[in-house]
UniProtKB/Swiss-Prot annotation:
Disulfide bonds: none annotated. Belongs to the NAD kinase family. It comes from Burkholderia cenocepacia (strain HI2424). This is NAD kinase. Transmembrane segments: none annotated. Its cofactor is a divalent metal cation. GO terms for biological process: NAD metabolic process; NADP biosynthetic process. NAD(+) binds at residues 75-76, 149-150, 177, 179, 190-195, 214, 248.
Length: 300
């Protein structure tokens, strides 16, 4: 738990193209400003909701100026701004205005009660890891990207299986025929990797997971690797192969291109209300233990 007022400037970021988001964002901005904080808006958010009276900044300007960013939206909004603010280590507070909300853990109905308490310094902090990836062609890097959730190499919707050659730390692992291969962080283990039968990794676990997508051989199973592993995935066969970084696509892959993935040097601080439990999030989002229960998150 952290205490003590350590924030002066608060940035607000909203989910784009979302009806009904303008009013809660404006209300939140006014209430935070009333408490004596400087409030700034992410530029696209400010323009979309038509708010005036607050500075509208680029993500880079937010990173240089804001002490914390509050994200009102879904997990995708949190992932997007998290990647952009990662080099600045700007802490994020997530308010769920989307559907699933694995990483935007504060309900919109609770934000007016919880946000002032957190801005006063009462919160729980954790660091989330990212992946950095590059595409190498003929020995030269042609593209770089960061990923919060995952790097996914997969076939297009109209092509057949792809053949991928995977190696870890320079050591050959296997050739795999499948619809693709996912490299996921612990945060991303509850995203696409989970729907492909991958394991759930606790966010504080120092690991990454490799998850095949519909492999031809059932013996190709997910594997958890140390988070300092250097993973290389080479395109050996197939056509119209894509690589996605948190679903941001690069579609011009060629045979023998290699996607190199490793843990990023950047981490993103997440701030949670006091009493936050990752297990509560899993239980609610995955509908575990749906029968009536009086159990709480205290150790028995």
């Amino acid at each position: 738990m952290k205490t003590g007022n350590q924030f002066k400037t608060v940035a607000l970021v909203g989910r784009s193209n979302t009806p009904g988001i303008a009013e809660p964002l404006a209300t939140l901005a006014d209430s935070i400003a009333t408490l004596g904080f400087e409030v700034v808006f992410e530029g696209d958010t400010a323009r979309e909701i038509g708010i005036a009276g607050y500075p509208a900044l680029t993500p880079a300007e937010i990173g240089a100026r804001a002490d914390v960013a509050i994200v009102l939206g879904g997990d995708g909004t949190m992932l997007g701004i998290g990647r952009q603010l990662a080099p600045y280590r700007t802490p994020l507070i997530g308010i769920n205005h989307g559907r699933l909300g694995f990483i935007t853990d504060i309900a919109a109905s609770d934000m007016q009660a919880l946000v002032p308490v957190m801005l006063a310094g009462k919160f729980e902090r954790e660091e989330r890891s990212l992946l950095e990836a590059r595409i190498v062609r003929d020995g030269e890097p042609i593209y770089h990207a960061l990923a919060f959730n995952d790097v996914v190499v997969n076939r297009s919707g109209f092509s057949g299986m792809v053949e991928l050659r995977a190696s870890v730390d320079g050591r050959y692992m296997y050739n795999q025929r499948s619809d693709g291969l996912i490299v996921a962080t612990p945060t991303g283990s509850t995203a696409y990797a989970l729907s492909s039968a991958g394991p759930i990794l606790h966010p504080q676990l120092a690991g990454v997971v490799l998850v095949p997508i519909a492999p031809h051989a059932l013996s190709n199973r997910p594997i958890v690797l140390p988070d300092d592993s250097k993973i290389a995935i080479q395109i050996v066969g197939g056509r119209d192969v894509n690589v996605n970084f948190d679903m941001q696509s690069f579609t011009s892959l060629e045979l023998n291109d290699t996607i190199e993935v490793r843990r990023s040097k950047h981490t993103v601080p997440f701030l949670h209300p006091i009493g936050y439990s990752y297990y509560t999030t899993l239980r609610k989002k995955l509908h575990w233990n749906e029968h009536a229960s009086n159990e709480d998150d205290k150790a028995s």
